[in-house]
């Protein structure tokens, strides 16, 4: 009897071993059949928390594709340069319009212009597509649009008896409003940041229609207008008055009545602002109310060995359901027209004038970038240092 039990136990062990071996071989076989594609992106912690589940859902819907996600939170483009230089670039690359020309001009990105059947470009804002073109060819499918609006603290307006701005205001009305709101050193009328993105609206609304060059007349005139907010009218905080505080921090502290910035601050202001606030478009200059329009999206490496799978991933990430989930974060203005006009963007939270982000698209212009755009901006930052700090 004992002998039979031992035989049965041995048979059971052998049987289980065979089954486990078979499962192991099946798993190895399945993994070998999968195509692995690499995808790189920058992004805040909150963005990545949304992105990672999207990638898992993609893998679930596409069991033959595995996504190797490369999150590069800092020095993204320096690392991307190195990856291309060493022929180890990802298959799918998150990119913005300011850096896209560098890679597109070098022939490193796949031309997606002829892929309308896959991506249905009519579903996206035309200007978001224009921003991601280089020399007439489309090199990325857009995720979002980035433009600038003026955030304003309604409590400060109420305190000093100043009417809220309307979307038809001009630069003279803007100056008049900012002067009334300025009560130094406690409160300044308008923000001042020395990064080019924040003074481009002042240049473009007064006639600049090309890449900014310091010695160009239109650029220089616009820069003088901007510098005057500090030096001439003193309605914006000078460097020593802001000290180590950012403009966003000053706005939250109630020290700025108006702050020129982008959609990316909405989640922060929703969470941290202890006052009522809203947004309005940039005032009209001699050329109208014109702010730069930037865009981010997904490009595909020309050297990718898995282009069909890479296109599948880009199609999924840029799809209606993916963009809806990304939009719910409050961080982006979606490039998909339907999503931008949906409950996912108009979510019954501040700002009340959320439609301003969309109306500004109509009057904005894609930032005039070139292959050397970053060098142009670095030169501008050097040359404007003195101009912006005249007391």
Predicted segments with their positions:
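Glycine-centered hinge/linker elements that transmit conformational signals in sensory
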Residues: 178-179, 212-243
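Hinge/lid segment of periplasmic solute-binding proteins
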Residues: 97-149, 183, 278-280, 346-350, ...
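Periplasmic solute-binding protein
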Residues: 101-108, 128-165, 192-211, 293-300, ...
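C-terminal capping/gating helix-and-loop segments adjacent to ligand/active sites or protein-protein/ligand interfaces
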Residues: 335, 339, 349-391
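Extracytoplasmic "Venus flytrap"/periplasmic binding protein-like
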Residues: 57, 62-124, 159-161, 250, ...
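Periplasmic-binding protein-like
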Residues: 315-338
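Conserved N-terminal structural module of periplasmic/extracytoplasmic solute-binding proteins
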Residues: 1-102, 164, 284-287, 308-309, ...
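A structural signal for short loop-to-beta-strand junctions that line the ligand-binding cleft
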Residues: 82, 90-91, 119-156, 185-192, ...
